[in-house]
């Protein structure tokens, strides 16, 4: 994610309960950090694709209507844990001169507690991974410690990741504390499985659903990072990475990191396709054209040619299905063809197919491809099944 934060791995301070109670920062000579960590947001302004959530939180802070607990849900890599740390930073933001008297979302500079909070080593911001600390004893420790005032910050903030992994007994032990916590305590929960969280817990929290980030937003974000890193990258390559990430910022940064290493600093679309095991987009469209014209011999020949150079039959069919979906969207929403996340060839030819193919044909192709993908995935000879 694009941001001013520059966190490092805490080298000390994790006690046996799973909480990080503070530790020493790393030495000045730091090893290489992956892009997902290097460009992790440190303020609400740095978050991308979550405007609705940021607006609600901003208004809550401005009006003083700050709840005792938040629960953040969404797919992997959209910023749940990062948002939790930013909330903790905003709650405890203080300047050395004492000019900030209460919680604020306006954090232009690093405050007294900011660095330690974003590095997950502040003694008043306690993080617990519920995936490895699922029992009632872990929650009892929170219940016992929450009564004590924070040591140095304004609030004691408990961040519990993957909260849906807590046991039923642990959730039940939490209810009273969660409903009536001390004024100095705040809770932030993060989960990818909101349906597994008991309604009794949800009713005590303010819920935010973090959305998948649109491909064009991811492309712009990756382009900004490429500029900062001094990396040359083709726009089409950014589009491929953005679509492959499926709305996950962390996934897009991980793939971009891998692409930079794969291409030795100059990221091209063909190199990214090779890295991801994708078929050449032009050849996928040629295969689609043969199928649309009913030229089965040409379609078989094109598929065999792609298979012979290493294309996975499942990937070829999935790419075909994705292109059918794109053409269908262009047919009903012509502006879809202006999305820069798709290559120029894909957009131009997509418009042409949308104009000449009927909805009935596109729908039939979509249904057949979905069935074909399912069959090929379980076939002993995928190429023959395709």
Language-model region placement:
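P-loop/Walker A NTP-binding region and its immediately flanking N-terminal helices
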Residues: 1-207
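Extended, largely alpha-helical regulatory/partner-binding modules appended to the mid-to-C-terminal parts
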Residues: 21-23, 97, 106, 113, ...
């Amino acid at each position: 994610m694009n941001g001013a934060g520059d966190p490092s791995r805490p080298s000390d301070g994790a006690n046996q309960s799973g909480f990080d109670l503070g530790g020493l920062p790393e030495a000045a000579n730091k090893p290489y950090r992956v892009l997902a960590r290097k460009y992790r947001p440190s303020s609400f302004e740095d978050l991308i694709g979550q405007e609705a959530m940021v607006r609600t939180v901003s208004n809550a802070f401005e009006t003083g209507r700050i709840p005792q607990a938040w629960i953040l849900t969404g797919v992997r890599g959209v910023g749940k844990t990062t948002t939790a740390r930013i909330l903790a930073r905003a709650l405890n933001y203080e300047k050395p001169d004492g000019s900030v008297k209460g919680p604020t979302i306006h954090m232009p500079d690093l405050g007294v507690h900011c660095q330690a909070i974003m590095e997950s080593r502040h003694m008043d911001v306690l993080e617990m991974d519920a995936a490895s600390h699922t029992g009632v004893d872990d929650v009892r420790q929170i219940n016992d410690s929450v009564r004590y005032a924070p040591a140095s910050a304004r609030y004691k903030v408990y961040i519990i990741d993957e909260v849906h992994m807590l046991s039923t007994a642990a959730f039940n032990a939490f209810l009273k504390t969660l409903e009536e916590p001390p004024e100095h305590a705040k809770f932030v929960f993060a989960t990818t499985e909101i349906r597994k969280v008991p309604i009794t817990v949800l009713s005590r929290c303010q819920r935010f659903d973090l959305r998948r980030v649109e491909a064009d937003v991811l492309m712009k974000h990756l382009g900004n990072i490429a500029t900062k890193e001094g990396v040359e990258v083709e726009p089409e390559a950014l589009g491929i990475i953005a679509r492959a990430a499926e709305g996950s910022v962390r996934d897009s940064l991980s793939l971009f990191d891998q692409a930079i290493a794969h291409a030795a600093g100059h990221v091209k679309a063909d190199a990214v396709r090779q890295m991801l095991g994708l078929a050449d987009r032009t050849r996928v469209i040629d295969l689609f054209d043969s199928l649309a014209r009913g030229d089965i011999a040409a379609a078989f020949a094109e598929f065999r040619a792609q298979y012979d150079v290493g294309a996975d039959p499942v990937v070829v069919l999935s790419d075909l299905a994705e292109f059918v979906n794109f053409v269908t969207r262009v047919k009903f929403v012509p502006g879809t063809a202006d999305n820069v996340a798709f290559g120029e060839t894909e957009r131009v030819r997509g418009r042409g197919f949308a104009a000449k193919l009927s909805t009935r044909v596109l729908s039939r192709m979509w249904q057949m491809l979905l069935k074909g993908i399912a069959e090929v995935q379980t076939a002993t000879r995928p190429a023959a099944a395709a």
